[in-house]
């Protein structure tokens, strides 16, 4: 099985090293094409205004000055000697759940693999802060992902669907199981922090806040909060089919 790895935290990210160890438990045909720098929050963006610069690190490791989407395209269309059987994106430092999947470069890497006709899985590891220090239990994803991915590949899933895996913030032995979940919903509060530079000109920092919101029992959020691994199938068809039918009826047109 040929596996292509990417991420959005960059070629030197610890999560990518974890992902490679996971992949090597599944196959010895593993390739890495990852961003040269951190591309977090760039979602499914492409680099169109400048050329893509590819740097070969060794025989099967490449860094690209581009987004996770660029990396998957580069891997599938140029770097690999043949099409991969699986694209793995991650392991992200921090969960990618609920509405946050729309911002996630990690999820976008898997999305691009899916668009290119390759089975694809995004992996993210929840963490906590100790003071101002981020504590990420990478060993949890590393311990549980290989077997889970193997089982998922054996089970299979339809074309046009990617799998989004999130691992809870706990030790490997404390994981309480696996849940197949729905994408949850978070309360959304984007705000701007305006400041002034040395010449008095304004600049801004973007901040995201989270208020309290009901959490559905079958959601990715609920699974992670309960100490379970969340497996969420996401499809590329964004059509709201029920609303489409309702609007067609309201307008008296075919839908």
Swiss-Prot record:
The record's cofactor note says: Binds 1 divalent metal cation per subunit.
Recorded hits in SUPFAM superfamilies, A to Z, give:
SurE-like
Q: Per the record, what are the reactions this protein catalyses?
A: a ribonucleoside 5'-phosphate + H2O = a ribonucleoside + phosphate
Main location (coarse class): cytoplasm
EC number, UniProt record: 3.1.3.5
Origin superkingdom = Bacteria
MF term (GO), any: 3'-nucleotidase activity
One Pfam annotation, family name?
SurE
Q: Where in the cell is it found?
A: Cytoplasm
UniProt keywords, alphabetically: Cytoplasm, Hydrolase, Metal-binding, Nucleotide-binding
**Is Lyase among this UniProt entry's keywords?**
no
Tell me where the signal peptide lies.
none
GO CC terms of this entry: cytoplasm
Cofactor(s) needed by this chain? a divalent metal cation
Positions of a divalent metal cation binding: 8-9, 40, 92
Top-level EC class as recorded in UniProt: hydrolase
Sequence similarity: Belongs to the SurE nucleotidase family.
PANTHER family for the chain: 5'-NUCLEOTIDASE SURE, 5'_3'-NUCLEOTIDASE SURE
Q: Which NCBIfam families match?
A: PRK00346.1-4, surE
Give the function comment from the record: Nucleotidase that shows phosphatase activity on nucleoside 5'-monophosphates.
Under which name does UniProt file this protein?
Answer: 5'-nucleotidase SurE
Taxonomic classification: Bacteria, Pseudomonadati, Pseudomonadota, Alphaproteobacteria, Hyphomicrobiales
Whichever gene encodes this chain, its name is: surE
